[in-house]
């Protein structure tokens, strides 16, 4: 189970760290990817420009924290296991936020992000708790 944990958490860490670099160096590319997901499911154009330095900085901080937390857990799961709870909370809030966005403005990109984040939270919890239990 420890090997599976490390494989999954490596994928998760990269899933957060690579987008941070994209948010920093190609923010329009990040928005374009989000828009493309919506276009797969609908012809409805994404209704927002997403051109704000404030939200870009907050997004970078949020996603960098997710990546850093995944790396911490990989470095020493037993020592940093308490970091799992805020990691799960942060990603769960993103999932709930996308669900609320979808309910108020039903664009398919929101639902796709909600479901992807929910699956990510489940994987984070499952693999970390199983590996931690196996260490005991």
Locate the predicted segments by residue:
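N-terminal signal-anchor transmembrane alpha helix
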Residues: 4-26
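Core segments of alpha-helical transmembrane spans in multipass integral membrane proteins
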Residues: 18, 37-74, 88-89
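Membrane-helix interface motif
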Residues: 25-35
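Juxtamembrane helix-break-helix junctions at the cytosolic face
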Residues: 67-82, 102
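Membrane-helix boundary connector in multi-pass membrane proteins
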Residues: 78, 95-113, 129
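Hydrophobic alpha-helical membrane segments
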Residues: 82-98
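Membrane-water interface at the C-terminal end of transmembrane alpha helices
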Residues: 118-136
